[in-house]
Curated annotation (Swiss-Prot):
It comes from Sus scrofa. The gene is TNC. Residues 1520-1735 form the Fibrinogen C-terminal domain. Extracellular matrix protein implicated in guidance of migrating neurons as well as axons during development, synaptic plasticity as well as neuronal regeneration. Promotes neurite outgrowth from cortical neurons grown on a monolayer of astrocytes. Ligand for integrins alpha-8/beta-1, alpha-9/beta-1, alpha-V/beta-3 and alpha-V/beta-6. In tumors, stimulates angiogenesis by elongation, migration and sprouting of endothelial cells. It comes from the Eukaryota. This is Tenascin. Residues 23-185 are annotated as: Involved in hexamer formation. Keywords: Cell adhesion, Coiled coil, Disulfide bond, EGF-like domain, Extracellular matrix, Glycoprotein, Phosphoprotein, Proteoglycan, Repeat, Secreted, Signal.
Amino acid sequence: MGVVTRLLVGTFLASLALPAQGGVLKKVIRHKRQTGVNVTLPEESQPVVFNHVYNIKLPVGSQCSVDLESASGDKDLAAPSEPSESVQEHTVDGENQIVFTHRINIPRRACGCAAAPDVKELLSRLEELENLVSSLREQCTSGAGCCLQPAEGRLDTRPFCSGRGNFSTEGCGCVCEPGWKGPNCSEPECPSNCHLRGQCVDGQCVCNEGFTGEDCSQLACPSDCNDQGKCVNGVCVCFEGYSGVDCSRETCPVPCSEEHGRCVDGRCVCQEGFAGEDCNEPLCLHNCHGRGRCVENECVCDEGFTGEDCGELICPKDCFDRGRCINGTCYCDEGFEGEDCGRLACPHGCRGRGRCEEGQCVCDEGFAGADCSERRCPSDCHNRGRCLDGRCECDDGFEGEDCGELRCPGGCSGHGRCVNGQCVCDEGRTGEDCSQLRCPNDCHGRGRCVQGRCECEHGFQGYDCSEMSCPHDCHQHGRCVNGMCVCDDGYTGEDCRELRCPGDCSQRGRCVDGRCVCEHGFAGPDCADLACPSDCHGRGRCVNGQCVCHEGFTGKDCGQRRCPGDCHGQGRCVDGQCVCHEGFTGLDCGQRSCPNDCSNWGQCVSGRCICNEGYSGEDCSQVSPPKDLIVTEVTEETVNLAWDNEMRVTEYLIVYTPTHEDGLEMQFRVPGDQTSTTIRELEPGVEYFIRVFAILENKKSIPVSARVATYLPTPEGLKFKSIKETSVEVEWDPLDIAFETWEIIFRNMNKEDEGEITKSLRRPETTYRQTGLAPGQEYEISLHIVKNNTRGPGLKRVTTTRLDAPSQIEAKDVTDTTALITWFKPLAEIDGIELTYGIKDVPGDRTTIDLTHEENQYSIGNLKPDTEYEVSLISRRADMSSNPAKETFTTGLDAPRNLRRISQTDNSITLEWRNGKAAADTYRIKYAPISGGDHAEVEVPRSPQTTTKATLTGLRPGTEYGIGVSAVKGDKESDPATINAATDLDPPKDFRVSELKESSLTLLWRTPLAKFDRYRLNYGLPSGQPVEVQLPRNATSYILRGLEPGQEYTILLTAEKGRHKSKPARVKASTAGEPEIGNLSVSDITPESFSLSWTATEGAFETFTIEIIDSNRFLETMEYNISGAERTAHISGLRPGNDFIVYLSGLAPGIQTKPISATATTEAEPEVDNLLVSDATPDGFRLSWTADEGVFDSFVLKIRDTKKQSEPLEITLLASERTRDITGLREATEYEIELYGISSGKRSQPVSAIATTAMGSPKEITFSDITENSATVSWMVPTAQVESFRITYVPITGGAPSVVTVDGTKTQTRLLRLLPGVEYLVSVIAVKGFEESEPVSGTLTTALDGPSGLVTANITDSEALAMWQPAIAPVDHYVISYTGDRVPEITRTVSGNTVEYALTNLEPATEYTLRIFAEKGPQKSSTITTKFTTDLDSPRDLTATEVQSETALLTWRPPRASVTGYLLVYESVDGTLKEVVVGPETTSYSLSGLSPSTHYTARIQALNGPLRSKMSQTVFTTIGLLYPFPRDCSQAMLNGDTTSGLYTIYVNNDKAQKLEVFCDMTSDSGGWIVFLRRKNGREDFYRNWKAYAAGFGDLKEEFWLGLDALSKITAQGQYELRVDLRDHGETAYAVYDRFSVGDARTRYKLKVEGYSGTAGDSMAYHNGRSFSTFDKDTDSAITNCALSYKGAFWYKNCHRVNLMGRYGDNSHSQGVNWFHWKGHEYSIQFAEMKLRPSNFRNLEGRRKRA
C-alpha cells in the first residue's frame, strides 16, 4: 500500500475515531474547513496541500461528560496557547507549498465508562489510526521524501504540527510559527530568548531583576516609578509634583523657605514662629489675642476688635464716622446721638414740645415747626386755609374754626340747611341751592318736572307718573291693570278691540268678527266636532269624523262600490269589480294561478310550478345556479374556486372583474361536469369580483359570487444604508408589480408603549430616512406594500441606533488650575462615559477618565493657568460607543504670590508680590478701608522681574485697608491675593496756645483725621525735667498748670493708637499776666439802635469784639470789631421791638478774654400790614391793606415790573385809604409792590407783594397750506410773553376735539391727521403757568383726498382689473384713464361708490399707464398712477398629427403679439417631462424618442423676453406595442424585433430598472438573454465575488452578465436555460425547463431541472449550490474550488461544468469544461449560457394568433 493510500485510510478512520485517553466528550466537535485542495495529487516536483477536518460525533449511549467550563475542562482540552478556533489559510499563488497537519485533542477522563462497547470500538479505531500515522511518519523520515506517488480520493486527516506550523516536504518536518518550537510545534518559544536576561516559562519571559518588557530588553526603574513618572532607559522621569529616584516623594507646590521650613509629603512644615504656604510668613504679636488672623506679620482683626494685636474693642459700626471711639464707646458729633451715633439728633431737642424720630421732631399737640417752636392751628386748618398765630384763615368755600366745614352755595336760598357743603332742602324744594320746586315723588323717574308738576313719559300717567297707561284706554271694553287691559266678556286683544269667538274655536280654527272659521277636518260653531270626508257622499252617516257606509258602498267617504267577497283580499276593487293580484284569478280572486304558466318548463299545481330538471324559480324560468362557491387557494397571481351543483348543466361561465374603477371584465368557460377551476394571470394585490353562472341550453342562471383579493408579495432586499443616533436610513429592492405605496414601520423593541412610527412612500421610492428615533434603542423595521388599502406581508429587520453623546457640555467654576465639567446625560441607556481632556492642539497630552452612567459632572485639577483645554465625552455601552462631544475652555490667570507690605506713611502704602505663572498684562489693585467705605482700584504694569512693586497714595491716615491684587490679561482677571495694611497716624492739627497766664497755658488743637486711642503731651520744665501727660482722644484742649511765670515752654502733642504713634505737633509759648474787661451797659435805646459802654485795663487790648444776638434766634448774629482804645459803641440798624443779647470780649497778644454780656430791647414802631392783590386784568389789578388807625399821615405806594424794564410808578395815598385800583400796566407782567406809611415824616417798615397782570388773547387767526389731511394755522401773539399756545380743532359736524400745544414763541403750527373734505372749527388759547387767555377762533375746510393703493390684478392678454382704496371723504365719482404704446388714451367715469373697474379690449404684451382721481363738485383730488403689462397671448390651435409608436408632429398658429421663441413641453403619464425651445418663426415640431402605447400631454408657451404666455395644450397617445417596456428578450421579440444584438430590457417592466443585454433571436425560435459567452480567451474570468455579482466583459465578445442581474431576471417568472457548445465544427446543447438564481442572501443559489439536449446533463451535479469565487468559498469540497481551478461557478466538490475556467487549458478540470461532452481534460472553444421564459412558445403562438 502506497503512502497516499495509507493516508486515505487514516483519514477515513480519523473521521470515525475519537481520542479516549482522557475520557469521552459530551458534545459534538465540528471545525469548519477554510481551505483545501482537490483529490488528485500532482507529480513529485509539484506542490501539495493537505488540510483536513474531523467531524466526530459522540456515541448516543455515552453518559460521560467533561466540564469544559471548569479548571479541568477547557484548559486540559486545548494546547497552552491554542486559539478558540483553528483557522488555516494559504496564499492564492502558493504553487510550491506543502501543508500537512494532523492534530488530536484528548481531554482528561471525566468518568469511568471505558467498558461501554461503543467506547471500546472508538478506542480500537483510534489505535489503528495511530499505527497508520506512525508508519507514515517513518516513511517520511527515511530520506526518500514524502507523498511522492499520485493518488485519488478524499482526504479527511486533521492538520499536523499542532495547528501552529506547516509541514515541509523538504525536511519532512514542521516549520513552526513564531512563538512555537519542537517537532510538532507544541512547545512555546519566548521572543529573542528573553535576551538572556530572564527565564522562558510557558512561552513568556520572566525577567531578571532590573529588566522588563515582553523580551526583557528594557531596563526597569525602581518601584516602576510608583506610577508617578515615566521610565526612560531605567531612569524615572517624574511627573509634575513628584521627585526622588523612584518618584515616591511629593514636591511642595511652593518651594519651602530653606531657613524656616522643610517639605514633607507635599506640604511645608514650618519652624516655630513662621507660617504660610512657604514658611516665609512670621507670626504676629500675641497671636492676635485669638481675635484675628496673622497676615504679613500683622493682625487682621475679627469683627469688633482692632489694635496692633487685636486687643482693643471697636465701637459699634465704628460710630458711623459721626463721633469718636474711646475703648468701645462712641462720643457722637453734634447732630448725632445713640450708642453708635447712628441716630440723627433733632434741633434744640424739639424745645421740650415733642419727640425726636430720625432727626425730625414729632411735635406735641398744638405745636409745629422744625423744632416745635410754632403754635399749631386746629387740624392744620384741614389744608383749606392759612394758619396765622394759631388761628385759621379759611380758603373760599370753607368755614369753621379749623376750616373743616364746607360752605353751601347761595346759603341754600333759605330753603334748606347746609350739611358738609351740600344743601339738604326743605320739603318741596330741590336743586344745588334749593331754589327749585320739587315734583311729587320726583315723577318716579318717568317724566320731567316742570314748575313742580310732572310731564309723564309715554306709557305712564298719574300726578307722579306712577301709573302705567293701557293702549287706547282698552277701547272702553275693559279695565287697565298695571298697563295691561283686562277685557270685558266677549272682547279680546291687547286693547280689547276684537270680538271673541265661542270656546276660542277650540283652538281648531280662526276667529273672524266673533265667528269661527274652522280648520279642515273640523266643524261646529266652536269647531269642536270632527268632520267626515265629502260628508260621506250621502251614502253613510258621520260618526266621530268617520263614515259608516250604507250596504254596497265602501271607502273613507263611501264613494266606492263594493266588490264580491271583497276580492278575498287577493285583488283590488275597481268600480265594484275585482282586479286580481298576480297569482290569483276569478270574479272574487278566489283561485290561484301559476306565474307565466311555468314558462313551459314545468307544471302548475295549486298555483305552484313543478319545474323540469335543471330549472327552478316560481315560473321555472331560471336555470338552477351553482351553490356554495368557495375560494380554496389564493396566490399572488391565481385564485382557485370550487362550487356545488346537483342539477344538469351544459357548462359554467366564470366572469371576474377587478373591483376598482375601469376594471376590465374577463371570462372563460368550463365543462358542466367540472365544479372547480383556477383563475390565472391575475394582478397581485387586486380585489376581484368573481361570478359563476350555470349554462343550460344557452340559458344563464343567476350567478353565485365571491370577492377575493390576490395576495401582495413580500418586499425584498431591505438593508441599512446608514444608522445614526436619532435616524436610520434603509433601502430595498423595487418590485415590478403595480401598487400604490410602500409602508414602512419603525417599532421600538425596548419601549413597547411608545407605539409605532408609520410612513407611506410613493413609488418608485426605494430608500427612506426615519428621523426622531431614540438613541441606543433597538428598532424593528418592517416594510410592506399597500394596494387598494390593503397591506401586504412585511419584511422585517432589526437594528440598534447609535448611542448619543452627552450634550450641552459646559465648563463651570473654571479657576487657574481646576474646572468643573458638567453635561446633560445622553438619552440612551449606557454603561458609562469616557471623559478625555488635554491641552488643545497638543494631541499626545491627553488624560482619560471612565465614569459611571449616573454621573453628570467631573472636576478636573492640576491644570496649567491661562491655557486652552479641550474636553471630549463619549458614551459607551458594551462594545458600542457614541461620537465624541467636545468643548473647549481656558483656565484662569493664577493669582500673584507672596503679597507683602514694604513701607507706609500716613497717606500711602508700598506693596510687593511675586508674579504669577501666567503672562499677565497688568495687575489690578483694589483697596478699601476695612471699617467700610468706597473702594478704589489702580492698575500697574507687570514687572519683567520675578516681583512687582506698587505704591498706593491718597489714603486716609491711621486706617487699616483691605487690599487685593489680581492679575489682568485682556478681559480676564485672576482671583486676588489679599493683605491688610494700615497707614500711619497723622499728627494733631492747628496746635496753638489760646490763653496765657502767669502759671498756666491753655492749649487748643484740632483732632487728627485718623482714628486713635489717646494723646500724649510732652514738655520740659525749666529745670530740664521732662513732663508727659496722657490725654483722652476726645480732648481738643488742655491747661498746663503750675508753670513758672515769664518762662518759655516747648510743647509736643502726639496721637497714639496701640503701639503706633503719629509725628508730634509742636508749639512754643511763654507765661504772662492777663488783662480784664467789665461794666458793660446799654443806653439811648430807639426802635432801631442803642449805645454800649464798658471798662477795661488800659493799653492791654489790641481789639474788642461785640456780638449782637437776637434772643429769639430769628435774626442773624451781628459782630463788630473795634479798636482796643474805645470804651463805647453805637449799634444801629436793629429791628424794632426785638430782644437782643450783647457779648463783649477783648483780644490781647496771645490771649482772648472770656466774654461779658448785657441785654437790650428796641422800641416798637407803627405797622402797615396785609397787603393783598386781587381782580387782576390785562392792564391792572386791585390792592388792599390794613394799618393802625390815626397813626399815619399818608401812604406811599411804589410799583415796578420785576424785570425793571419800565419806569417805576409811585403813588401817594391818603391816610384814610385802604384800597386802590391800579391801571395802565402791561399785560402778563409781574410787578413788585411796596407800601409804607408816613408818620411825623418817618417811614414805617414797608410791606411788599408780587402781582401779575392777566394775559392778552392771540389775534387775527388765519389758515394756509390746506391739504386733504393737514393745514397751517397762524395767529398774532399777545403783547406779553406766554409759555405756550394750545390749539383745539374739531369738525363743525361734531366729533372728538384734537389738541396741539406749541411753544409760546411760535406764531403758527401745522394741524395734522385731518379728515379730507371736512370743515373744522379752530381755537387758539395762550397759556402761561396755570393761566389761560380767552380763545381766538376760525374755520377751515380740508381739501378733497384722492383714491390710494391703485393696483391691477387678473391681468390677461386682453383684460385687467383695476382696484383701489376709496377716498376717505365722500366723493361724487372717479375718473379713470389708461393708455399704452401706440394705443390712444381711453377715459371712463365711474360712481364714487366703486372701488374696481374692469379694463377690456387691451392689446397683448403692451405696457399700459393707468391713472385715477376723485371729483366732488368743483373739487378734484390728486391723481394716482400705476403701470402694468398685459400678458403675451398664447399660440393657437395646438394639434398632434402623424402620431406613431415613437414619433408625433405638433403644429400651431402664432399669437397676435410678436414673440422671441416658443417653449414646448411634453410629458408622459409616468411623469417623464421634456422641454424644447424653438425659434419665433417655427409653427411645427417633430417629437421623437416617445414610448409606445403612452398617453402624452403637450403644451406650448410663447416667449417674448421675460414675458411668457399661458400654455396651450393638447393630448395624444402613441401607437402601442405589445410590451412597451419588455422585461426580457422574449418580449422584445414579441414586439417584432427579430435581429440578434444589444437590447434594453426593463426588469419587472419597470422603466426605472433598465438593463442592457445581448438577445439571441435565432437559436430555437429566439428570445434568449445570453448571460455567458466564451469564445476567444480575451476576457479574464478569474475574478472576485464583487466582479461576478456586478458582471464584466464586452456584450459583443466574451462577458458575464452578473449574478445580481440574473437574480432579478429569474425572479420575474419561470425561465428555461439553454447552453450552446461548439468545438472544431462539433456542436452540442443542453436545455433545462426550470432555471433560477437566488438573491445575494442565498449567495445566488442555483436551481436547474428538466434536462433535454445533446451535451449531457452536467448541470444536475451543481443544482442547489451557491455561487463560489476564490474570495468567497461556498462549495462542499475540502479545497477552494475557485482557487484551484482559477474560475468561478456553482461549485460542489468541485465541478462537472467549469465554463468560467481557463480558456484553452486542457489540464485536468482547469479549462472550459462540460464533463458529459468533453470531460475534465478538454477546454471547449465556444460556450454560451442563455435563458428565456419557459412559456415562450405559448406566448409566441398567442402573438401569431393575434
